[in-house]
Amino acid sequence: MKNKLIAKSLLTLAAIGITTTTIASTADASEGYGPREKKPVSINHNIVEYNDGTFKYQSRPKFNSTPKYIKFKHDYNILEFNDGTFEYGARPQFNKPAAKTDATIKKEQKLIQAQNLVREFEKTHTVSAHRKAQKAVNLVSFEYKVKKMVLQERIDNVLKQGLVK
């Protein structure tokens, strides 16, 4: 009798101990994914400098064959990997705008002139303004096809309203 009672009490204590340790371990594991107090600021020769002024030497063991993947992206283009190491990420690609040639500048000026003449035609509704605006729109380059179509639609809308003699 006593042996059965002792065995049952030991089993219950073991079950309670196991559940408390699993709950405690899951609570500790969830803390790692929240906001960090220490954030890496720079990396120089495998020495990571953190924002609180501390340093850490990092090394990835040669025998570590687990695949390396990005765990977290920090500020200053610093990547944290699953094995705890840090590296700078790829440099961002900036496309520099090409220098405008004289031909493109002239094409843009023709477009601006056409826009101004169409605006004037919308105000005046005269035949001479229509001729100037239509000629300017016809001279706009094919590279500005969409803008050219918009200008032509604006001219057509004014023509539907009628001209002033």
UniProtKB/Swiss-Prot annotation:
The places in or outside the cell where this protein is found are: Secreted
Identify the Pfam families for this entry. Answer: efb-c
Q: Name the domain of life this protein comes from.
A: Bacteria
List the record's Gene Ontology CC terms alphabetically: extracellular space
A molecular function annotated in GO for this UniProt entry is:
complement binding
Q: Please state the span of the N-terminal signal peptide per the UniProt entry.
A: 1-29
As recorded in UniProt, coiled-coil segments are none
Query: What does the subunit comment say?
Result: Interacts with host fibrinogen alpha chain/FGA. Interacts with host complement protein C3.
| Protein name as annotated | Fibrinogen-binding protein
Give the gene name: fib
